[in-house]
Amino acid sequence: MSNKLAALIILDGFGLRDETVGNAVAQAKKPNFDRYWNKYPHQTLTASGEAVGLPDGQMGNSEVGHLNIGAGRIVYQSLTRVNVAIREGEFEQNETFLAAMKHVKEKGTNLHLFGLLSDGGVHSHIHHLYALLKLAKKEGVENVYIHGFLDGRDVGPQTAEKYIKELQDQIEEIGVGEIATLSGRYYSMDRDKRWDRVEKAYRAMAYGEGPKYQNPLDVVKDSYENGIYDEFVIPSVITKENGEPVATIKDNDAVIFYNFRPDRAIQISNTFTNDDFRDFDRGDKHPKNLHFVCLTHFSETVDGYVAFKPVNLDNTVGEVLSQNGLKQLRIAETEKYPHVTFFMSGGREEKFPGEERILIDSPKVATYDLKPEMSAYEVKDALVKEIEAEKHNAIILNFANPDMVGHSGKVEPTVKAIEAVDECLGEVVDAILAKGGYAIITADHGNADVLITEEGKPHTAHTTNPVPVIVTKEGVTLREGGILGDLAPTLLDLLGVEKPKEMTGSSLIQK
């Protein structure tokens, strides 16, 4: 085995900011962290927003953080992936969308767009619908019909009118599209096999059955008058002046379902695409030979084309270490064990050859502010023993405390949590240095740095503040502007391993 040793130490939820009020990171006595910060090259990293594949300004989290760290690149979450594709012009070149549009032009049939009508960004984004309308216009598709699912859950409960008006303005401006049905997500986006709900949405879309209105806004107005708000609006059909539905989904039509989150998109998709569907009677005129497009991969059961296929994360840090014959150890307590294993390996459960894992049980307490040290000392003891035994070249370690205790929004226990972690950090890093190894000390996102809101209430969420990075190697400098995706390349650099082409991050050590 190579005698090289480098460790990646993640202080979970340890963000940096200058203001000390409500900031447990600043208030804690942490002589070891401060000693390393003052002695060794250090910088800050961006751990939120587009730097970790989330929408601009969105706080990071442990899952996303560890995915980015392990992948050595920005791992785009679905919403951001589509946003970036629209911005960069790739969206309008997407072959799956273009094939659907070609299908309806060749067959002389209709294109139906359906999905959640809001900018909540949890299941869908209305801007993705607008991008599809623009693409349909550009491709010369004339018969485009929208089946809008009303939200009221990821956005305010009475906001549907705003989104319908905005959509109507876009339709007018772009010059294509017409609203055909509207239904509350309670019906169209059920995920709990309540098929009576799904059937109502299906029958409105496929058969034009349900309450009928000429003006889409009247659907909402009428519902509100009956005390029924957005999420629960009964699937309703928009009609022409003669009372006929504007459009129903028929044989040989194309559908693009623009929700990106799968769980609530699967049932309604199966209703339209699955030949063996038996959960309710779809009737004699069930639309056949649909060209059905899902924005992302919904499920193996959905028989449709996928516009944004799953991204396989090849050559994550664990795989590269393994390929180079290096021995690695992943260690954390229960709360963050999946993060240093599954998420660090890009969503892979199995170990790589040469990978060892140590799981230390988290304490059995109702909330961790009751035991701020959690299992940090046990993690430290187990790890120091491993370092002494000289069995591993690479160590990936997570101290959970700043995040898990920080979620209490209580300053005093979180200060204690950080002080416990600092004590453990000192023993671990000094043991590594004594073996001639290197440590990278960093974090995956902020949390313990903001525990009080501007109104003086407990702040229990993550933050968008930068996180520290210290590399315990003297005589080098670290570059500015780093991101979490640069940490794996830095670890490989310390071990003298070339980073693979898939890792678009780069070592923080300036050459």
Swiss-Prot record:
Residues annotated for Mn(2+) 2 binding in this entry:
D12, S62, D444, H445
Q: Which UniProt keywords apply?
A: Glycolysis, Isomerase, Manganese, Metal-binding, Phosphoprotein, Sporulation
Q: How is the cofactor bound?
A: Binds 2 manganese ions per subunit.
The protein's annotated catalytic reaction(s) are: (2R)-2-phosphoglycerate = (2R)-3-phosphoglycerate
Provide the active-site residues from the annotation.
Answer: S62
Phosphotyrosine modification sites are Y36
GO terms of molecular function: manganese ion binding; phosphoglycerate mutase activity
For this protein, the parts annotated as crossing the membrane are none
- Family listed: Belongs to the BPG-independent phosphoglycerate mutase family.
Q: Which named protein is this?
A: 2,3-bisphosphoglycerate-independent phosphoglycerate mutase
